[in-house]
Amino acid sequence: MDYCLLLEMAVNLGYELAMAGAETYRVEESIRRVLLTYDLESEVFAIPNCIIVSIETPEGKPMTRMRRVGQHGNDLDAVEWFSSLSRAICNRRPEPKEGISWLTKVNAMRKTYSLGASLLGNFLAAAGFGLFFGGTMADTLWAGILGVMVGLTSHFFASIKTNPFFTTITASFLMAFSAYALSALGLTDSADAAIMGTVMLLVPGLLFTNAMRDIIYGDTNSGVNRIMQVFLVAAGIALGTASAWNTAEMVFGTPADQYILSYSGTIQVLAAAVGCIGFTFVFNVHGHGAPLCILGGALTWAAYLLVTYWGGNDFVANFWAALFAGFFAETMARIRKCPAISYLVISLLPLIPGGGIYRAVNFAVRGNMTMFADTAIHTAAVAGILAVGILMASTSVRLVNLWKTQHK
């Protein structure tokens, strides 16, 4: 057997998973299982920007392969495809050359949305969450249009390979300044609602979720790496929106505090569902998985509202809703034999504190440092509570699976 080709096949599979946005443990476990199928023990080390794999052939010859992982996106469909390929290789044990051919075919077969469809997703995501955060119909429409602006900005900078931090700052500035300009012209009722809805497109939901799951599975280096990326993106959003507020103040005068509407639970759940529909385009979800992701997002917010109805505070409601989202994702993953991350990311979106990030920045630029500190601490605490909910759901499922394995 050509062990060089075998190692190349395994590393390339891990690389494709990493580029699609898979968790570190999934990348490492997929490589390890593929090599074990060929009776090879391996040492696999992966972090978000690098994969290193070492094996020893039956003749005692050590071999190591390293591959750098560049900037990667949010392609949940690719995570499903390559996870399925990993299982197929483990079940059928093809020759390495044939396995590499399978990898090439999967790359050619997997689907991606066109730019137009992606922009439609941006519109729906921003519009849905604009309504979710209490905007009027006018705010919702403008949030959708600003979402398209963010999509075009991100697409342009990605095409010229600009640093993501700069892209986030620029997109945040253009979006927020446009919202303040629309408010000054009397075209929106609440620039804040439109901005909060659109900011959800920039909030690193997949990064945050993967960071928590990496830490859960003991991949602390990767988890901390991703958490730092989350902080950088949040800082980029803060810099962009703060600069937009200051610029708008010079051009139009101080942006007024605007009233945010309070909708019924039913409308909030429907708005969350619309936002999640948009994110199925943003995260490249196809087929039967898309409606299940949307259902997960709607039910997660319904769970949040139910806990608050029973008297739970914001932290308690976020914990139970995150726990529900975790169990929902794990259940769907086992029913459909797909990675749980495909369902968890979108199911969690209504809980991701994008609005909290914007409110904290807004208080800071207005000089209300007491409210800034309170809101920033609350937002960080919510993120921590979500992590605990995800941790408990994932750990519970792993313990149940371990018990079943031991008692077969």
Which residues fall in each region the model found?
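Juxtamembrane non-transmembrane "cap" segments at the membrane-aqueous interface
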Residues: V345-G356
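Short helix-coil transition sites and intra-membrane helix breaks within transmembrane domains
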Residues: G21, L202-G205, P353-G354
